[in-house]
Amino acid sequence: MEVIVPFSTERPKSRLSAVLTPDERAAFARTMLQDVLAAIDAADGEPRILATGAVGIDLPSPVEIDDRPLTDAVNAAIDARLGNDGAERVAVVMADLALATPNALRELFAAGREAEVAIAPGRGGGTNAFVAGHPAFRVDYHGASYLDHRRIADEIGAGVRVVDSHRLATDVDEPADLAELLIHAEADGDGGRAARWLRDAGFALDTTDGRVGVRRE
């Protein structure tokens, strides 16, 4: 299954500006992208990067440049693949799902083969990943996009499967999300490139106030 991975090269991860410099945010975003690509590949997906500009590192997957807003770029990519009797299914997986595992993605892909639309909602009402097989399905990433995508699927008469996955629901956007990444990396024995990048940058789990957070040494 072809898997589109949108990636923004313009001011990436701006909500991490309290803990990372602009250069660090760009580097961290690229490591998360690499983790997502590796997980997709291990799940027998075929990742294709949809970037707003040059990514800046060598990657094993093809890169398509589209500097339009996310909704427009993803809709164009879907239309190019599902329109005119094209591919039977196409997936979209966000590049900041650093907790994504091959097993979680296999579950998403399997759901997408059984339903016309399979959605993995994110925390806070977003849409972190989906598989579309209905040629009329389109995205709208503004606001509570999970609800919007359920509505869009209903309007076109597409059957929907919801994939309830902590691994796919957790996108790394804010400082509190860094703790989630380090927790699972420790539980898994190492973690991926993004977790190693954080540790190399001096980040560690902090439980001094009774809640789990991160500190930078």
From Swiss-Prot:
Keyword tags: GTP-binding, Nucleotide-binding, Nucleotidyltransferase, Transferase
Is GTP-binding included in the keywords of this UniProt record? Answer: yes
Show the GO MF annotations.
Answer: GTP binding; phospholactate guanylyltransferase activity
Q: What class of enzyme is it?
A: transferase
Catalytic activity annotated for this protein?
A: (2S)-2-phospholactate + GTP + H(+) = (2S)-lactyl-2-diphospho-5'-guanosine + diphosphate
Q: Which InterPro entries match?
A: CofC (IPR002835), Nucleotide-diphossugar_trans (IPR029044)
Q: Coiled coil located at which positions?
A: none
- Pathway of this protein? Cofactor biosynthesis; coenzyme F420 biosynthesis
- Its GO biological process terms? F420-0 metabolic process
Which Pfam families has this protein been placed in?
Answer: CofC
EC number of the protein: 2.7.7.68
Q: Does the keyword RNA-binding apply?
A: no
Function summary: Guanylyltransferase that catalyzes the activation of (2S)-2-phospholactate (2-PL) as (2S)-lactyl-2-diphospho-5'-guanosine, via the condensation of 2-PL with GTP. It is involved in the biosynthesis of coenzyme F420, a hydride carrier cofactor.
Q: How does it assemble?
A: Homodimer.
Question: What family is this?
Answer: Belongs to the CofC family.
Protein name per the record = 2-phospho-L-lactate guanylyltransferase
Organism, per UniProt?
A: Halorubrum lacusprofundi (strain ATCC 49239 / DSM 5036 / JCM 8891 / ACAM 34)
Taxonomic lineage:
Archaea, Methanobacteriati, Methanobacteriota, Stenosarchaea group, Halobacteria
